């Protein structure tokens, strides 16, 4: 009987802990990016927080600021594929196609099997009318 009671107590504690959500995550999930940014600003910048900051900035249409955030991450870890992909997307939106290509190429060097990045890179090449290069990538 003690074992069953202990097991129930542990299960309920685990469930209660799982229900606690991070206010930043909650703001991001609610598309309240301004609140998320203000909460992120109060914390010590770490890669996961900077990724969230970049996402919030991009969602608000602040692509130049988002690019700076992703570049900060890349400066600390040049193999962070998520930051590289997001930086490429920001560059593409800002019509910095040469820089976007460089980011996509870096990701493809790190993860050649990444189909999403390959497709985005091919689309970028096609948009620039670099048909031979795009054909070589497909």
Residue ranges and their predicted role:
Residues 52, 86, 120-123:
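Canonical tetratricopeptide repeat
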Residues 29, 59-60, 93-94, 127-128:
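Register position in tetratricopeptide repeats
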């Amino acid at each position: 009987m003690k074992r069953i009671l202990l097991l129930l107590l542990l299960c309920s504690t685990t469930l209660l802990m799982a229900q606690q959500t991070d206010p930043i995550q909650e703001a991001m999930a609610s598309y309240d990016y301004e609140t998320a940014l203000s909460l992120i600003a109060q914390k010590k910048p770490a890669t996961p927080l900077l990724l969230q900051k970049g996402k919030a900035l991009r969602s608000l249409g602040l692509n130049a600021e988002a690019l700076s955030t992703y570049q900060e991450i890349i400066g600390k870890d040049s193999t962070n594929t998520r930051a590289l992909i997001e930086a490429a997307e920001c560059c593409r939106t800002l019509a910095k196609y040469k820089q976007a290509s460089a980011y996509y190429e870096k990701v493809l060097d790190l993860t050649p099997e990444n189909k999403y990045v390959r497709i985005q890179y091919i689309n970028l090449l096609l948009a620039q009318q670099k048909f031979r290069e795009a054909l070589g990538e497909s």
